[in-house]
Amino acid sequence: MLMVISPAKTLDFETPPTTGRFTQPQYLDHSQELITQLRELTPAQISELMHLSDKLAGLNAARFGSWNPAFTLDNAKQALLAFKGDVYTGLQAETLSDAQLDYAQDHLRMLSGLYGLLRPLDLMQPYRLEMGTRLANARGKDLYAFWGTQISEWLNEALAAQGDDLLLNLASTEYFSAVKRSALKARIIDTEFKDFKNGQYKIISFYAKKARGMMSRFVIEERINSPEALQAFDVKGYRYNREQSTPDKLVFLRNVVED
């Protein structure tokens, strides 16, 4: 089973990594093409394109300017340890053992607007480029056009390498839209996490993101390799709901938020 998750806006390049092991991103030629274009933008243009404050626009203009594909532990960090959003709070990658990191390296991928697809130990330099950014480029009107079927083809390669055709989608709609389902040689398993609020079960973004990270951790710890085994996920009060689920969409409900 191969999992895909979204990246995060929040980054941590200050905390020392918990491992000295790393790999290099596989698709830096594509990243370099984007960086070359992004360097032509002024901070004001970046602010308008990405809907950022002047301060954040200036920060990311500087990041684009200093981006250098000669990645080392001195100027970059492993992707799974660098991202620090809600998904990664749920995943708690900093507490994974070496054996669990090895498993994650084979069975987990992070989608990225700049890097396309990252493995957990791939080094990355800090950036801000959400997949939904409408950056017109030589390949089309936005980043979805830029990546085209490429991400799907890379996922096919990863699926073939890890031994089955199961792709567990734990990414947001914005990011999984960069995966062309028609180009995938995979059975896609989608997920929904709902919390009880105001008399009904609903998807609450903050909790759903954390749950995606917790399920990623669950798969890594238990070495899950089937949709049926995923039904046992019961972290922090979530329970599989058979009535709302289908074979290719697993729904988990929670009545009370657990710390």
Swiss-Prot record:
One of its GO terms (cellular component) is cytosol. InterPro entries: YaaA (IPR005583). This is UPF0246 protein PSPPH_1119. Belongs to the UPF0246 family. It comes from the Bacteria. GO terms for biological process: response to hydroperoxide. It holds the Pfam family H2O2_YaaD.
